[in-house]
Structures are given as structure tokens and as C-alpha cells.
Amino acid sequence: LDNRPKTLELASKLLINPLRSSDAARKRYVFSDGKLNLLPESPVSFLTSDLLSLYGRLRVMYEFFAPRGRADDETLADFARRRLGKEAYEKLIDPMASGIYAGNPESMSLKSCFPKVFNLEDKYGSLIKGMIKLQREAKKSGKRKVGAGPGGTLTSFHDGMGMMIDSLKGYLKERLRSGSKVVSVERKNKGYAVHLSDGMVVETEILVIASPAYSASEILKNLDRPLSSVLSEIPYPSVSVVCFGYRKERIADKLDGFGFLIPYKERRKILGSLWDSSIFPGRAPDGYVL
């Protein structure tokens, strides 16, 4: 997403141009009741959409009047059912959360995973009330429209996200050391000693660990055992990404959209599908789709 100026500044410094997603990427689908349903993009399209039943749509509108929650935190599932109703949770919130985290909304902390949503209820007492007030404030100040989500436009690069990594490697040159596994970290003087698998020790005053929690847990055992223990308890869902390429004429649908997500209640074996060649140009050879 292009809502982080520092990322765009880095791309500019590396002399690589961001590639914005196509207009088709705005169309997103949910597989429900045996068919693909277009996600509503506006309040009007939501009212006329058949993704939710009439009762389900009315229940979402009742959110405006629903009482404020009393708990300091709750799961995303509990929050969604309480404020939006069971049907909206199952068909909208569940697949949305799975698409972002690939996890179970029944165990996701609302405050940690969706702080903007938590703050809307906490500050305004209602998601709808909060959105209306934020939109009015944004209009007065001349800002772009705001939302409860991260906002921004989906952005990549001509040769994919790997282009930024390759450009960073070229920019850093000998200052970058790759292919060496970090075995452990320990305190040394006023800084840290980083032990690598090839026997080399790197000493530094500042250390940033940008790895999965389970890897950081192993690295930090000798430095901070309590922190290592906490990191080891953070759950990670097991996810596989499978890429399929087809000749365009073999696909009946024109794949005009971002892709689709599947609610857990549908009991399918996949979380969803992204239509990469529809999102960004150059992701598949001519005559093919990815």
C-alpha cells in the first residue's frame, strides 16, 4: 500500500518507480452460497447487494444504535457478532481477517490486530458514527477519505516486490552480508555481539531484529530468556501459496478483479485466490493468466 511515505521515499532513493494496481483490483469477491459475490464498494451498493440477506443488512445498519462494549479487549469474532451480527461476521469479517492474517478471528485480539476499528468504537461508540465523523473532518481539512482499514492504493514494482530487495542489495553492496545465519546474540560492552553460523561475530551498538517471532525467540535465548519465551508463544498459522498459470482461452471468466476470499463456513480447503495478472501488468506472458 502506498500509504507509507517512507517506503515511497526509499523507492525514490533506489531509483525504482512504484507500480500502482489496475482499476480492476478494486473489485473484490467473496465466495458464498456456491457463487462469487462482489463486495459492495459503497453504502448504496451494500443496501442492494445480495451478499447478505435483508435481515443481515438491517442488522449491520443497527450497529449505529448498538451499545458500546465494556471489555478492554475482545476477539475480532466476538466484536463483529456483537456490533454487526452473525451473518456479517461469517460472510464479511471472517474472510477479510483470514485474507490479512490467515488466522482464526475467534482468537484474534481486536485491539492488537485492528486497532483503528477498536478506536472507532472506543471514541465514538459506533463504527458507523465514527466513520461519518471522520469523513466530515477529512472533508473540512481537505484530506483524502479515511477509513477503518489501512487505506492507500495497492502498489508494487515492475518486476515485483523482489525488485526493491535487489535494489537494496546493489545499493548497500559490501555493507550487506547475506547467506549467514544468526545463531545467537549477547550483550557486549554498551552494545551487542551477533554470532553467525560461519563463526564470524559482528559487534554493533544498535540491533534491529526483523524476523518471525519464532526465529527471534531462538536468537535471543542467551540475551533475554523471558522475552525469548514470550516470542515463542506467538502463534503462526501454516499457509501454503500455490501459483497456477493458464492459457487465457482456458478460463471462462475474464478475471476482472483482485480475486476472492472464502468464509470458513463454506468449508473449503483454500482461503481464497488472487488474480495476479489482473492486479498488475506484466505478471504473466501474453495469452496467459496467473
Regions found by a protein language model. Give the residues of each.
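Short, flexible helix/strand-to-coil boundary loops that buttress conserved ligand/catalytic motifs
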Residues: R4, A11, I93, L220-D224
